[in-house]
């Protein structure tokens, strides 16, 4: 019986350790699993630079992502930042359901490429008057995303906790991930403690 319990505890601990390592790895590293090798890098698009790749981990404030396809290229923006020219810093926050709107997709992709918003090609959703980026330097908030320009204020840079990692970019810490790791560590400790008590008795 002790041997069976020992084997059971060992298996549980191995699974918990693997989950711990997997969570940490997936949270901090871009990994391409979609068959687009060109996506596993930082991709320059005309004047704009996007972070491209696939991020695992389900970060609480960056869990949604947009993927743009242009020929064989795949561009991903994860509720983060991209750069237009060397001085302008732009931030977007998107809703996931917009990914199903192909016409809006194309309009927004055009904005990414040209760093300009073409209102005549913008579909009704989102409305150009309500939600189009304010290129004059202010901020425009609509039902679907938030745009802010650094030409009026640099405070918005702190709105989305981001930092670069391995040249690709990562989007802060996830409280849920930290809780999960703490729980895994606690379970590992408790199971080992019970194993020691069980063997000694």
From Swiss-Prot:
UniProt entry keywords in alphabetical sequence: Glycoprotein, Membrane, Signal, Transmembrane, Transmembrane helix
Transmembrane segments: 179-199
Membrane topology: Single-pass type I membrane protein
Signal peptide limits: 1-23
Entry GO CC: membrane
Glycosylation sites noted in the Swiss-Prot or TrEMBL record: 114, 134
Main localization of the protein described in the UniProt heading: membrane
Region: Disordered, residue numbers: 122-157
Cytoplasmic domain ranges by topology: 200-201
Annotated Polar residues bias: 123-148
Localization per Swiss-Prot or TrEMBL: Membrane
Domain of life: Eukaryota
Residue intervals annotated with topology Extracellular: 24-178
Protein known as: Putative uncharacterized transmembrane protein DDB_G0281897
Organism: Dictyostelium discoideum
